[in-house]
Amino acid sequence: MNLQDDQTSADLFQVATFYSFTAWTEVTIACLLHDLLSLGDEHQLMGTVLLAEEGVNGTICGSVDGVSALLERLESDLIEGLFELKISWTPEQAFRRFKVRRKAEIVTMGLAGLNPSKTVGTYVDAHEWNDLIDDPDTLLIDTRNDYEVAIGEFKGAINPQTKCFRDFPAWVEQQLRSMVKAQTPARIAMYCTGGIRCEKATSYLIEKGFTNVHHLRGGILRYFEEVSQTESRWQGECFVFDQRVALNHQLSPGVHCLCHACGMPLTPEDQTMNSYLPGVQCRHCVDQFSDTDRIRFAERQRQMEHSSRK
């Protein structure tokens, strides 16, 4: 596996975002838990890897050699061609710690019986995505959470306004089914950050009787890699679940930061408001917490700032 990039330098950390829906036994999972933790410690990797009977989902950050070592170990237990991988770069470590966890699901929808490794929608490559979503007969759905959609989306996409992926099935039954019946679109197209949520969402829709269901292979991050900004249909930045908070179309850290009180992404304008106190409150949560909470948040922020100066 060649993970080198002629635009990178030794000063940058490599970030690998990956997933695979593949059937694993408990023996395989136990071996991977041991081996991945050892590799993370050996190479000083940071990030999170989730393992389940349905596959693997993770984002890790570290040196090129360290990231390569962990990915090669994973791929030894994967079927070739079923490993979705995106690489980006950051000048600072994107995570604070390294975790490998055994989970019931690698992306939690909360439903038993779904098997994306067997039943899944039609993959659409990034270079074909514009033609698909430009078609007025395509119903475009964002499968991410509401706070992610708030800072960037494909133009014309439906926002289910979910707080977590567990909410998606209820939205399908309460709103999407009647929407499809009324609009009779030729097809449904879905997308997410890296491809894993929209892939599982297509499996769910097909199980529930929906037809002509498509999803963006590799998600928004793959689209950023392969589609030029001049041709892009993307508006805004893409939220990511690490210290970078958001990425722009060049896959570089964007302008958003995170409110460590409520977890909402904040624009530069949000950060200039009188209601904003770093780590304590923002416009989204100014009336949400008690004075006791704010005292605790302020102390946590002080400790974080002290740690970052070391």
UniProtKB/Swiss-Prot annotation:
GO biological process: tRNA modification
InterPro entries with a match to the protein in the record: Rhodanese-like_dom, Rhodanese-like_dom_sf, TrhO, TRHO_N
Residues at the active site: 192 (cysteine persulfide intermediate)
EC main group: oxidoreductase
UniProt keyword terms in alphabetical order: Oxidoreductase, tRNA processing
Keyword Oxidoreductase: yes
Lipoprotein as UniProt keyword: no
SMART domains xrefs: RHOD (SM00450)
PROSITE patterns reported for this sequence: RHODANESE_3
Residues of the Rhodanese domain: 134-232
Gene Ontology MF annotations: oxidoreductase activity, acting on paired donors, with incorporation or reduction of molecular oxygen
Record-listed E.C. numbers: 1.14.-.-
Swiss-Prot/TrEMBL catalytic activity: uridine(34) in tRNA + AH2 + O2 = 5-hydroxyuridine(34) in tRNA + A + H2O
Top-rank lineage group of the source organism: Bacteria
Family of the protein in this entry: Belongs to the TrhO family.
Cross-referenced NCBIfam families: PRK00142.1-4 (NF001136)
Purpose of the protein: Catalyzes oxygen-dependent 5-hydroxyuridine (ho5U) modification at position 34 in tRNAs.
Protein's UniProt name: tRNA uridine(34) hydroxylase
UniProt organism field: Prochlorococcus marinus (strain MIT 9313)
Phylogenetic lineage: Bacteria, Bacillati, Cyanobacteriota, Cyanophyceae, Synechococcales
